[in-house]
Amino acid sequence: PSSNKLICVGLNYEKIYPVEGENPPKPQNIILFGKDQSSIVAHNQDIEVPLGAAAQSFDYEGEIAVIIGKKGKDISPSNAFEHIFGYSVFNDGSVREWQKHSIYAGKNFEKSSSWGPHIITKDEIKDHKKLRLTTFLNSKLVQDTTADKMIFSIEEQIAYASTLFTLFPGDLIATGSPDGTGGSQVPKRHLISGDILKITVSGLTALVNNIV
């Protein structure tokens, strides 16, 4: 899959912060960052562990992705649903130690993230707040949540992003990741070559990637 803008939301679930290993205060505002297309691979393509020291804190983040279907600027939360085309599955690959000095650097290693393989249209979902997200690392369940656990709703995320720039059809918003990433575990469990990552969102084909 490809998209125009890859917009990601940080700290959108109550959880242990995988960068610092502690419970952060609840954010008062939506935290946004972006990803380059070069950081993304598709379903069944290999995710590459970064070279050198970055490999020691390479982590996964299963997320629900929202695909924009209608152009908009300064969208109100009450009208945001009109601008959704559908939903998909996203893995926000992250190098935790690099995040400490630069979110952009920590989130944009080449071939570190993935999304897909399919999009389910919004009319196929009765209530998007009940979308269930699960992540499996080597068949072990490590993340399990629903969209109604988000701190900022999907509508609020769309509205906020649209105050910064015009949203276009094909833009993607990755809506944040719940507890259970490797950096929040004790002991930490970061990705290594040979791992298999599987992320599911209800109603969609699982996103599966080998880690090499």
Where on the chain are the PLM-derived regions?
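Catalytic-pocket segment enriched in acidic/His residues
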Residues: 16, 96-212
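Active-site microenvironments in enzyme catalytic cores
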Residues: 1-141, 210
